[in-house]
């Protein structure tokens, strides 16, 4: 676990992302423009601004890892889902992340 309640540690995230990416759903809660400029391979874009009205469209069957560029929006997404759908398994990545168009990234935990 990361430092914030509900967060996943960067090392744990990177291990899952590299070794078992199909074991989780990655949801990028940034705006589409940010998403188009680079994201994690296999991620789904579901902006925080639309999340509440799309809660029933969230994928089920595997845990969800929410992420954004700095951890604030992903933390809000996690809290929102826990409030309305507490049975869902979700965590968020509390980290500063920068992507390039080719999918490369740098990540720094909080």
Predicted regions located by residue number:
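Short, surface-exposed ligand- or partner-binding patches at beta-edge/loop junctions that are enriched
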Residues: 67-68
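Rhodanese-like catalytic fold shared by cysteine-dependent sulfurtransferases
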Residues: 1-24, 32-63, 72-110
